Structure formats: structure tokens, C-alpha cells
From Swiss-Prot:
Role summary: Catalyzes the attachment of alanine to tRNA(Ala) in a two-step reaction: alanine is first activated by ATP to form Ala-AMP and then transferred to the acceptor end of tRNA(Ala). Also edits incorrectly charged Ser-tRNA(Ala) and Gly-tRNA(Ala) via its editing domain.
Cofactor list: Zn(2+)
One Gene Ontology cellular component: cytosol
Stored Gene3D superfamilies: 2.40.30.130, 3.10.310.40, 3.30.54.20, 6.10.250.550, Bira Bifunctional Protein, Domain 2, Threonyl-trna Synthetase, Chain A, domain 2
E.C. number: 6.1.1.7
Record-given protein name: Alanine--tRNA ligase
GO molecular function (one): tRNA binding
Cofactor annotation comment: Binds 1 zinc ion per subunit.
SS bond partners: none
GO biological process: alanyl-tRNA aminoacylation; negative regulation of DNA-templated transcription
Catalytic activity, reaction form: tRNA(Ala) + L-alanine + ATP = L-alanyl-tRNA(Ala) + AMP + diphosphate
Length: 874
């Protein structure tokens, strides 16, 4: 059976047993911030097992995509060198949420594996393990299924603590847990290894193919196990492993799925498929990279993006080992889509995007590799000993995006090691700097703890009455606030919108007889709305009835910008591709800011197309439709939800442009798209790797922006004595004249340097037949000094040269050594000494080096170092 047939057979089998087929969840866990990537089938059902979520079904079956690379579960360094380690794998699973338990789970597993209708595995080839004290499971296997006792193994606490066992599973130190039973396949005595529980169990003869976890206890902090009222089942069978068994091979890389990827990788690289470890690395990594990018991860220098970058660069490195010329990795995506696109449609939908991201990262890595190697070479040139300092490793990582494992590979090739402790110290220092930079003061609002909820009545209008439920001053609950005092007011109901979803909180005022409280901002604490402000007059007390009035002009201006972000989001997905997803936003009364996933800068013509598309929807003046429904119905209608956002049972769906934009949103919006008036992008740029930002204005601020631009054009035209119509021609003429003058200046500098070179050559000192020259040349930049050193090398023959000068209050230094002397002394060594003398740094090649510093008063001392440097070396 092919891998795709096995996957479908598994899902169909459990559908026939009353299970609901559930699609694989994203590789980015939606409900577990502690998890880097989805790494097991049960991840998406965690809240079901904890009793926090109820679904419409109590039986489920999935083929879950999983990644293990980075974090606690990290197989990266083993991939390619063993038969069964992967960064990406599929986990087939069946789950029971308080429905069936051990008996049915065991019988289902045995039936699927051994019956003639399904996989037809020889029963005598299967071994089973159970937890040592799980007599119930043991009896089901032996007395009902009929597994002989000699192929049953009880596994005790083999990890040094109670319930610490290969056959006892726990979600954590406390919480749901229980025994598990595992099924092993015996590949035969021609392969080394012993049965589970034996000293030789790590061999490849007996391979675990299916694990059934029985969650039947809740472990409390004292270590006591208490029976769960509704026990559950969580099972997992690796598709790659069961495919290897059914296809009669002993390595996952020999199954049909991997063979097609290995062949595609060999074609892309230009090598033969001969089972090389590096080729296996590439074939494995295209799966994890393709699926991670399809799920919205982009290469970066932190978090999930950094893990993705490491995997891509590891694949590129291994491709280069096999002789790849130029970028190749992105060319394997088509084979991945052909192999797995039917089961996972997101691969087909995102194929072009995946290829672009990979190609872009490959090209960027080639530049990084070249630049990083130059820096590393400079540091290694002056290395004393065989350990690369931690600060060097950190500089390569932090400044140049050089993965630490890549630096380690280069070090190993040169019989060097890394100062890993030093690197960790640098990393820790960076974390401390980041923490101290963000800890700038006490946020008293974070201390506010409120019981009860505020009902929001602001969709219907901008005013309403409310009762004061609580008052806070500097985070402390108080009974009253007097004139001049700042505080927080909580009402039972309010028209004030609380900051959420990127939209700022409303401002306005609360009034009662003899009282006015100016509301400067509104936020949320749980279900309560916090009105932040100051008492302008009178005294505000708990229980008081107040009239709440929102600043309607600010609310309306904010609504224009919020509605425009929805139109912009839809336009981005239409013009740039469906890989675009919102990463953050800020909406206030003056502007909008929208962060989104995209791997490259937006071209000017694309920005114009975005503006045109949004303004076209504004001119259509279509009604903004608002509907409240349940989350599943909303998603079925195509409504976009923000990743990681928690939604209640009822959600608010906003539709604009007759379906052009459909999003879940609780913010305030315009009634018709025409109310926005005008949309104008003011800036676009990158804020992080794979994340771009657009800032824009709407309505009156957009018109003011265009008027300002018009006025600046008029002023620019006036400066060049032209008009708006001929401004570009005038500027072009000025730039061309400037280029001519710069060229003439360079020619004059070259003549002056040549003349100076003749004079300088005569002042060189001879040391053991070698000419040594150190001279001060103020006013020349680094480029001019380099040219002068080259000229002096030709004039002097065998020579050591150090030139320096002061330009713009900074010291510029250039050192040169003729090629015949570089085996005895190096320009980089001389430069490091000279630059240090003027309070700076420098380095370079053995024959030419540059540097500089800030202490101009020490320049002559620095130049004086050239002669003793040469004397000592010669």
C-alpha cells in the first residue's frame, strides 16, 4: 500500500466506527502558548481532554501534521543520519472524549492492523507492551484479543520515579494522566535488536508502530492519582513508520513518499540518488519547511521563524555539500505538492508563496554566508588558541543572522571549538537589556481586579446612562474620587468602546449633578470596562448614576480608519496573495497602522494598486453588513479570524463590498464604505523578518496629506526656479551637474594623491631591505587613502605602509603590506594595533586593512607603531 492509501484507510476505518474525521490543525498551536509547534495528534484536543471545551462529537480521527525541531522536542540534528528521525511527520490518531475506553481502543487497533479488510499484518509479528500494573489492558490483550503471553511485555517505572515510565503518559506534573499500551512490529532476526524492555531494545528489529494512551487519572500535587469521571483515549501511529512496515523496508526514507522527494531533490541539486545522508536531510526538510510556510511561519531571527530559518539553511548547506550550484531548494516544492497536496490542500493553495519564500531565503543565505564568512575570517586571523570566543559567535548570530550550528560546522572543519558558555552569557545579557528597556514604570491599571461585567451599549449610539460599580485610584479600590484626582471608573453599562482588536479606547466624559469626569481612555479587565481619567469637578462615588458621553467626532474618525483596515486587508490578500495575514494593527482617529505577513518589500506599482483597490470599494459606497452568529457558521461563510484571538459562542461578522471583505470584528465601523471618503498610504516598510507594515490616513487627514504634498511640490519647484510641470526635468539636470562635479573632484583628488605619493615614497624608511612608510594625510577619506596605499605599493616594491588622517573629527586609517611579505606580517595585525591606539577597531586581509577611531589627538602615536611592528616581524 502507498502512504496515501494507508492514511485514507485509517481515517475511513475509524469513520466506520463512528468517529468524526477532523482536519489536521495548524502547525502553530492555537490553544497552547507553551508549545513551539504542534507535535502530536492530541494537541488540538487538549482542552477537550481537560474538560474545558465541548465539541459536537465524542469520537474523532485525524491525520495530524507535526514538527519536531526546536524546543523540548528537537530531532533536527539526527535527521538524515537515522532511519526514523524527521523534522516533519504525520501522526494518525483516534480519540475518545469520555466515550469508549480500553476495550474498544485495543480491539479497534488490532482489527485495523490484522484484519483481511484492512492492513493484514501477520499477528505473529506483533508484540505488545502495557504498564506494569495495568492488569485490565493485559487481560484484554491476552484473553480477548488472543496475544500470547510470550509476546506481551509489562513495563514498569523505568525512568527513576513513580509513574515515570515509557508506558505511563502525563500531560504534566499534575493533571490528566494514565497508562498506555504500545504495539511493536518485529522486522525479523536478520536485523539486530531485542524486544521492548530488553537490553537490546534500542535496535531496529522491534519498532513501535502504535501507542494507545488511556487517560483515566488526575494526578494532584501530592502525587496521588484520582480516577477521572470520564476517562478518555488518545492514540498515535506514525504514518511513515507503518508505511515502512507495509512496504517491507526498514527505513522511513525508503517508503514511496520519501523516494519521490529524494528523486526530486537529486534532480534539483544535480546529483545521483544514492542514499546519501545529505540528500535525506534535504528531502526531510522540504516537508517541514513547506508546511510551516503554508501555515504562516516566515523565516526570521526569533521564535518559530528562527527554527524555520535554521531548517532551510541546514537543507541549503547539505545541498551545497552534494554540489548544488545556486538556489535549488525551492524547486523541490512541486514534488512535495504532488505527493501531499491532495491530503493537505493548503500546500496547493500556497505553492507559489512557499517557492518564493524559499528562493528568497536561499538567496539571502548565500549573501549571509559570504558576509559572515568574511567577518569570521577576520576574527579567526587574530585568534589565539583553538576556541572561537562567545562574543564572536554572538556577533555572527545577532548582527549577521548566522546560525550558531553553522558557525559550529565551520569550526569543526578547522579543528576549532565554540565557547558555548560565552555565547550563552552574551544571549543572557541581551535578554536583560531587553527586559530593562521595557520595564520603565509601574502600570497601576494592571493592579485593577474587578468582579462582574460591563454591558457595552456603544453600537447603538455614543451616549447612555450607567451606574458606578467600582472606583480605583492607583490600582486600589476606593469609595470616591474628588476633583483633581485621577482614577478608573467601572460602570454596569457603557457606550465607551474599550481598546481591543487594535482599535483605541473611546474618550469623552461622565456627568451627574455637580460632577464631571473626563474620560481619556477606555480599556478592559476581564469583562469589565475601565474608564481612565480625572475628576474635573465634584465628587464621584460608588453607586452613583452618571450620563456617559463619548466624543463622537473621535469615534467617527476612528471608525473610518478601522473600516479602512478591513478593506486594506482584503486588498492585500487579493493583490499580494492569500498568504497575507494580519499580524497586528493600530487604529485611532488620525491614522491606521496595519502589520501583515509578507516576505519582501512591496513594489511601488503594488502600493498604487492597493490604494486604487481600496478607493474603488470606497467609491462603490456599499453598505457595511453586520451579523451576529456562531463561530462555525461564520467560518463557513469565509469570515477571517485573527490567529490566537479567543472568540465566544456568538461572534460579530462584518461584511464589506458585498463579500469583498468578511471578517470577525467587535470594533466600531462606518455604515457605508463611502463614509471613509478617501484612503491614502503614507508609508510601507518592514518591522520584522517576514512582517511588513503599512500606515495610511483616511477622510479629512487624507485630504490634508495630499494638500501638504501639493504645497511641498510647489515649494520644491520654486527652489529650482521651475514649475510643477517641469520639476522632474529641473531636478534631473541638477543631479547630472552634481555627478559631473563629483567626477571632476575625484579626478582632482587622484592627481593630488599621485603627487603626494611621489613625495611620500621618498620619506620611507628601510628596515632589512624592506621599505616602511607611516604618514599623516588629513582630509582624505578611506577610499582615497586606499588608492594612495595601492599606488605606494607599486612605487616602493617590498613595503609596509600605514596612512592615517582626520576627516569630520574622526580618524581614518589604512594599512598595506605587499604580497611578498604577507607570510611574515599581516596588514590586519598592524591595523588592530593602530586602531586601538585611537580608540577604535579595524581589520581586513593580510595585504590590506582599514580601521578608524575617535581620538584624533592620538593619531601620530598610532602612525608611529608601524616602524616597531615591521622591525619586530622582520
Amino acid at each position: 500500500m502507498k502512504s496515501a492509501e494507508i492514511r485514507e484507510a485509517f481515517l475511513r476505518f475509524f469513520e466506520e466506527k463512528g468517529h468524526t474525521r477532523v482536519a489536521s490543525s495548524s502547525l502553530i498551536p492555537a490553544n497552547d502558548p507553551t508549545l513551539l509547534f504542534t507535535n502530536a495528534g492530541m494537541n488540538q484536543f487538549k482542552d477537550c481532554f481537560l474538560g474545558l471545551e465541548k465539541r459536537a462529537y465524542t469520537r474523532a480521527t485525524t491525520s495530524q501534521k507535526c514538527v519536531r525541531a526546536g524546543g523540548k522536542h528537537n530531532d533536527l540534528e539526527n535527521v538524515g543520519y537515522t532511519a526514523r528521525h524527521h523534522t516533519f511527520f504525520e501522526m494518525l490518531g483516534n480519540f475518545s472524549f469520555g466515550d469508549y475506553f480500553k476495550r474498544d481502543a485495543i480491539h479497534y487497533a488490532w482489527e485495523f492492523l490484522t484484519s483481511d479488510k484492512w492492513l493484514k499484518l501477520p499477528k505473529e509479528k506483533l508484540w505488545v507492551t502495557v504498564y506494569a500494573t495495568d492488569d485490565e489492558a493485559y487481560d484484554i490483550w491476552t484473553k480477548e484479543v488472543g496475544v500470547p503471553a510470550e509476546r506481551m511485555v509489562r513495563i514498569g517505572d523505568n525512568k527513576g520515579a513513580p509513574y515515570a515510565s515509557d508506558n505511563f503518559w502525563a500531560m504534566g506534573d499534575t493533571g490528566p494522566c494514565g497508562p498506555c499500551t504500545e504495539i511493536f512490529f518485529d522486522h525479523g532476526e536478520h536485523i539486530w535488536g531485542g524486544p521492548p524492555g530488553s537490553p537490546e531494545e534500542d535496535g531496529d528489529r522491534y519498532i513501535e508502530i502504535w501507542n494507545n494512551v488511556f487517560m483515566q487519572f488526575n494526578r494532584t500535587a501530592d502525587g496521588v492519582l484520582h480516577p477521572l469521571p470520564a476517562p478518555s483515549v488518545d492514540t498515535g501511529m506514525g504514518l511513515e513508520r507503518i508505511s515502512a512496515v507495509l512496504q517491507h523496508v526498514n527505513s522511513n526514507y525508503e517508503i514511496d513518499l520519501f523516494q519521490s522527494l529524494l528523486n526530486a531533490a537529486a534532480d534539483a541539486i544535480g546529483c545521483a540518488n544514492e542514499g546519501q545522508a545529505s540528500l535525506k536531510v534535504v528531502a526531510d526538510h522540504i516537508r517541514s519547511c513547506g508546511f510551516l510556510i503554508a501555515d504562516g511561519v516566515t523565516p526570521s531571527n526569533e521564535g518559530r521563524g528562527y527554527v524555520l530559518r535554521r531548517i532551510i539553511r541546514r537543507a541549503c548547506r547539505h545541498g551545497n555539500k552534494l554540489g548544488a550550484k545556486g538556489s535549488f531548494f525551492h524547486r523541490i516544492v512541486a514534488a512535495l505538492v504532488a505527493e501531499m497536496g491532495d491530503a493537505f490542500p493548503e500546500l496547493k493553495q500556497q505553492q507559489a508563496h512557499i517557492e518564493r519564500v524559499l528562493k528568497n531565503e536561499e538567496e539571502q543565505f548565500a549573501k549571509t554566508l559570504e558576509q559572515g564568512l568574511k567577518i569570521l575570517e577576520q576574527d579567526l586571523a587574530g585568534l589565539a588558541g583553538s576556541v572561537i570566543p562567545g562574543e564572536v559567535v554572538f556577533k555572527l548570530y545577532d548582527t549577521y543572522g548566522f546560525p550558531v550550528d553553522l558557525t559550529g560546522d565551520i569550526a569543526r572543519e578547522r579543528n576549532l571549538t565554540l565557547d558555548e558558555e560565552g555565547f550563552e552569557r552574551e544571549m543572557q545579557a541581551q535578554r536583560e537589556r531587553a527586559r530593562s528597556a521595557s520595564a520603565f514604570g509601574m502600570d497601576y491599571n494592571s493592579l485593577v481586579k474587578v468582579e462582574g461585567e460591563t454591558r457595552f451599549i456603544g453600537y447603538q449610539g455614543t451616549s447612555g446612562s450607567g451606574k458606578v460599580l467600582a472606583l480605583f485610584k492607583q490600582g486600589m479600590l476606593v469609595d470616591s474620587l474628588s476633583a483633581g484626582e485621577e482614577g478608573v471608573v467601572v460602570l454596569d453599562q457603557t457606550p465607551f468602546y474599550a481598546e481591543s482588536g487594535g482599535q483605541i479606547g473611546d474618550c469623552g466624559y461622565l456627568e451627574a449633578q455637580g460632577l464631571r469626569f473626563d474620560v481619556r481612555d477606555t480599556s478592559k479587565a476581564g469583562g469589565a470596562f475601565l474608564h481612565h481619567g480625572i475628576v474635573d469637578s465634584g465628587t464621584l462615588t460608588t453607586g452613583a448614576q452618571v450620563e456617559a458621553t463619548v466624543d463622537a467626532s473621535v469615534r467617527q474618525a476612528t471608525a473610518l480608519n478601522h473600516s479602512a483596515t478591513h478593506l486594506l486587508h482584503a486588498a492585500l490578500r487579493e493583490i499580494l496573495g492569500e498568504h497575507v495575514s494580519q499580524k497586528g494593527s493600530l487604529v485611532d482617529s488620525q491614522r491606521l497602522r496595519f502589520d501583515f505577513s509578507h516576505f519582501e518589500a512591496i513594489k511601488p506599482e503594488q502600493l498604487r494598486a492597493l490604494e486604487d483597490r481600496v478607493n474603488a470599494e470606497i467609491r462603490r459606497n456599499s453598505a457595511v453588513e453586520i451579523e451576529e452568529t456562531d463561530i462555525d457558521t461564520a467560518k463557513a461563510k469565509g469570515a477571517m479570524a485573527l490567529f490566537g484571538e479567543k472568540y465566544g459562542d456568538t461572534v460579530r461578522v462584518l461584511t464589506m463590498g458585498g463579500g469583498f471583505s468578511v471578517e470577525l470584528c467587535g470594533g466600531t465601523h462606518v455604515n457605508r464604505t463611502g463614509d471613509i471618503g478617501l484612503f491614502k498610504i503614507t508609508s510601507e516598510g518592514g518591522v520584522a523578518a517576514g512582517v511588513r507594515r503599512i500606515e495610511a490616513v483616511t477622510g479629512a487627514p487624507a485630504l490634508a496629506y495630499l494638500n501638504d504634498a501639493e504645497e511641498q511640490l510647489k515649494q520644491a519647484a520654486s527652489l529650482v526656479k521651475g514649475s510643477r510641470e517641469n520639476l522632474l526635468d529641473k531636478l534631473g539636470g541638477l543631479l547630472e551637474r552634481n555627478r559631473q562635479l563629483e567626477k571632476e573632484l575625484e579626478q582632482l583628488k587622484a592627481k593630488a594623491a599621485s603627487a603626494a605619493g611621489n613625495d611620500l615614497a621618498a620619506s620611507a624608511v628601510e628596515v632589512n631591505g624592506i621599505r616602511v612608510l607611516a604618514a599623516r594625510q588629513d582630509g582624505l577619506d578611506g577610499k582615497a587613502l586606499l588608492a594612495l596605499v595601492d599606488q605606494l605599493k607599486n612605487k616602493l616594491g617590498s613595503a609596509v605602509i600605514l596612512l592615517g588622517g582626520v576627516q569630520d573629527d574622526k580618524v581614518v586609517l589604512v594599512a598595506g603590506v605587499t604580497q611578498d611579505l604577507t607570510s611574515r606580517l599581516k596588514a590586519g595585525d598592524l591595523m588592530r594595533q593602530a586602531a586601538a591606539a585611537v580608540g577604535g577597531k579595524g581589520g581586513g586581509r593580510p595585504d590590506m586593512a582599514q580601521g578608524g577611531g575617535t581620538d584624533a589627538a592620538k593619531l601620530d602615536e598610532a602612525l608611529a607603531l608601524a616602524l616597531p611592528f615591521a622591525q619586530q616581524a622582520l
